[in-house]
């Protein structure tokens, strides 16, 4: 029986893929499958992964599933992997990142003991530019939490939407898909999932189980490519607050701030930014829970834009 499936899209990671695969294989246990998705990579990343497994860990080959697709982005890669995943729970790993010790042991233990819908955990962050490792403290203490309105408010304000910071039951994920051809697909998907699973139990684990590699080649750090701009626009459309989902205003405001920031960085005219903001903020229904940014954006739009301009100037 497969308890956990971990999905790993692969694209142009020759420099990192062996470290990623080694971090998986040196702790792999029964009940786990690893789905490697070749997202049409033009280099030898997938071949390196296959060869490394075959030569050093042939006894684990039957726990790996290999998918080849034309280049369609990691959203489609994850969606295709979800269709064939056999695990009761689904985890994610980026192919330039790597697992920390006891990832599988700790998660399988929680899955067997707690029977929760979602598991959260912490990670380390390695900055390739600065050459240091730091902690990403998503979870403060080991506990079972109930996914209610108060919990979602805290979660939405934290804004830790990386797929690899959580494991989710497959029957929950099957009701959703990652949006294709956009960046920030995780931020577009996971807030919806947490509303859908209202009332479910979430186990929060303080342990650091993944190391995230922060590097210049990452898509979000490479200027403003079209998929990033599309993702921001889609986020603004998807998260207009409603009476059923008032906390969407937090996500909506985050996307709106990103949109205005990109307009400033791309040197669009002050008046185009001003009128865009005025037009959009009418969708925000303020209440005491919403941050000061929303208040500034709705009632002091010029001040809000000036703050963003100053922030970008001093970066």
Model-flagged regions — what are they?
Residues 69-85, 95:
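Glycine-rich, basic loop-to-helix element that forms the pyrophosphate-binding segment
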Residues 23, 38-48, 94:
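A conserved acidic beta->alpha catalytic loop
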Residues 208-215, 221-254, 259, 266-284:
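Catalytic core of nucleotide-sugar-dependent glycosyltransferases
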Residues 102-136:
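Conserved donor NDP-sugar-binding/catalytic core segment of glycosyltransferases
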Residues 266-315:
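Membrane-interface aromatic/basic loop that binds lipid-linked glycans or pyrophosphate carriers
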Residues 149-225:
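Conserved nucleotide-sugar donor-binding catalytic segment
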Residues 90:
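Short aromatic/hydrophobic "clamp" motif used to bind/position activated sugar donors
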Residues 13-26:
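Short, well-formed alpha-helical segments that are part of the catalytic scaffolds
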């Amino acid at each position: 029986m497969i308890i956990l499936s971990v999905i790993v899209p692969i694209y142009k990671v020759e420099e990192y893929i062996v470290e990623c695969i080694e971090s998986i294989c040196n702790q792999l246990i029964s009940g786990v499958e690893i789905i490697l998705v070749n997202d049409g990579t033009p280099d030898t990343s997938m071949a390196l992964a296959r060869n490394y497994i075959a030569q050093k860990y042939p006894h684990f080959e039957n726990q790996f599933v290999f998918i080849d697709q034309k280049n369609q982005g990691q959203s489609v890669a994850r969606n295709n992997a979800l269709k064939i995943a056999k695990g009761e729970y689904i985890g994610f790993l980026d192919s330039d990142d790597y697992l920390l010790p006891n990832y599988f042991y700790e998660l399988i233990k929680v899955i067997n003991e707690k029977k929760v819908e979602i598991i959260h955990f912490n990670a380390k962050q390695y900055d390739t530019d600065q050459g240091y490792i730091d902690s990403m403290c998503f979870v403060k203490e080991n506990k079972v939490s109930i996914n209610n309105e108060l919990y979602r408010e805290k979660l939405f304000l934290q804004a830790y939407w990386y797929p690899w910071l959580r494991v989710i039951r497959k029957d929950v994920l099957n009701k959703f898909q990652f949006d294709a051809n956009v960046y920030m697909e995780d931020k577009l998907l996971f807030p919806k999932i947490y509303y859908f699973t209202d009332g479910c139990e979430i186990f929060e684990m303080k342990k650091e189980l993944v190391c995230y590699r922060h590097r210049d080649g990452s898509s979000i750090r490479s200027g403003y490519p079209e998929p990033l701009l599309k993702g921001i626009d889609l986020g603004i459309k998807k998260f207009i607050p409603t009476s059923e989902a008032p906390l969407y205003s937090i996500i909506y405001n985050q996307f709106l701030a990103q949109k205005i920031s990109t307009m400033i960085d791309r040197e669009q005219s002050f008046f185009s930014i001003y009128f865009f903001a005025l037009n959009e903020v009418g969708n925000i229904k303020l209440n005491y829970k919403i941050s000061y940014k929303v208040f500034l954006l709705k009632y002091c739009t010029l001040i809000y834009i000036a703050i963003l301009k100053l922030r970008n100037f001093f970066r």
